[in-house]
From Swiss-Prot:
Keywords from the named record: Autocatalytic cleavage, DNA damage, DNA repair, DNA replication, DNA-binding, Hydrolase, Repressor, SOS response, Transcription, Transcription regulation
Entry EC number(s): 3.4.21.88
InterPro entries named in the record: LexA (IPR006200), LexA-like (IPR039418), LexA/Signal_pep-like_sf (IPR036286), LexA_DNA-bd_dom (IPR006199), LexA_repressor (IPR050077), Peptidase_S24_LexA (IPR006197), Peptidase_S24_S26A/B/C (IPR015927), WH-like_DNA-bd_sf (IPR036388)
Annotated organism of origin: Cupriavidus metallidurans (strain ATCC 43123 / DSM 2839 / NBRC 102507 / CH34) (Ralstonia metallidurans)
Family in the record: Belongs to the peptidase S24 family.
NCBIfam families the record matches: lexA (TIGR00498)
Gene it is expressed from: lexA
Purpose: Represses a number of genes involved in the response to DNA damage (SOS response), including recA and lexA. In the presence of single-stranded DNA, RecA interacts with LexA causing an autocatalytic cleavage which disrupts the DNA-binding part of LexA, leading to derepression of the SOS regulon and eventually DNA repair.
The protein, known as: LexA repressor
Length: 218
């Protein structure tokens, strides 16, 4: 395992803890603010150093495109989802592919397969995995083909990444609520945000994102 400088260890720990608490890594700007760096470019330099040492992987062009490749903690708790490991408690979760218009997201015809993941990586237990379609959440590190771990919920706090149903469509976006206005925010400037009005637009929450499995190998 690579030896990290004290500052690199602090940044690694911040990334790990942010993933545990929110399901997603911090942005460069958030890292810079946490450590008092003059700009996000300083955070980028530290991230590249961590990547060179092989402890993280960076996704080009994504502000939250940071993936942990190793665990550095006393408990050696995995921070990323992985294939099943012998002797580790596994969760069996349904993997949802394309969702047909007007039908429940966990309807049998939507289940591509059952998938096993290490239970210890979740602070909140997910109910299912959803295969992501498209790049509207690219800058949150959520890419086309990735598997989003989702906990069923009908309410969510501002800033959470959610699975929402809009009429007959299901989408993954970041939630922002202001009074009766609901905004579903894309994490990619090539996509428009969706603005809705409670009581007037057909909208419901299907769940909250609690983690991510990168698509490579699936």
């Amino acid at each position: 395992m690579a030896t990290l400088t004290p500052r690199q260890q602090q940044i690694f720990d911040l990334i790990r803890d942010t993933i545990r608490n929110t399901g997603f890594p911090p942005t460069r700007a958030e890292i810079a603010a946490e450590f008092g760096f003059s700009s996000p470019n300083s955070a980028e330099e530290h991230l590249r150093a961590l990547a060179r040492k092989g402890v993280i992987e960076l996704t080009p062009g994504a502000s939250r495109g940071i993936r942990l490749k190793v665990t550095r903690s006393d408990s050696e708790r995995p921070d990323q989802f992985s294939l099943p490991m012998p002797g580790v408690l596994q969760l069996t979760l349904p993997l949802v592919g394309r969702v047909a218009a007007g039908s429940p997201i966990l309807a049998a015809e939507h289940i591509d397969r059952q998938y096993q993941v290490d239970a210890s990586v979740f602070d909140e237990r997910p109910d299912y995995l959803l295969r992501v379609r498209g790049l509207s959440m690219r800058d949150a590190g959520i890419l086309d083909g990735d598997l989003l771990a989702v906990k069923k919920a009908s309410e969510a706090a501002n800033g959470k990444v959610v699975v929402a149903r809009l009429g007959d469509d299901v989408t993954v976006k970041r939630l922002k609520k202001r009074g009766d206005t609901i905004e579903l925010i894309a994490e990619n400037p090539d996509f428009q945000n969706i603005v809705l009005h409670a009581g007037r637009d057909e909208f419901s929450l299907e769940g909250i994102a609690v983690g991510l499995i990168r698509s490579s190998g699936f």
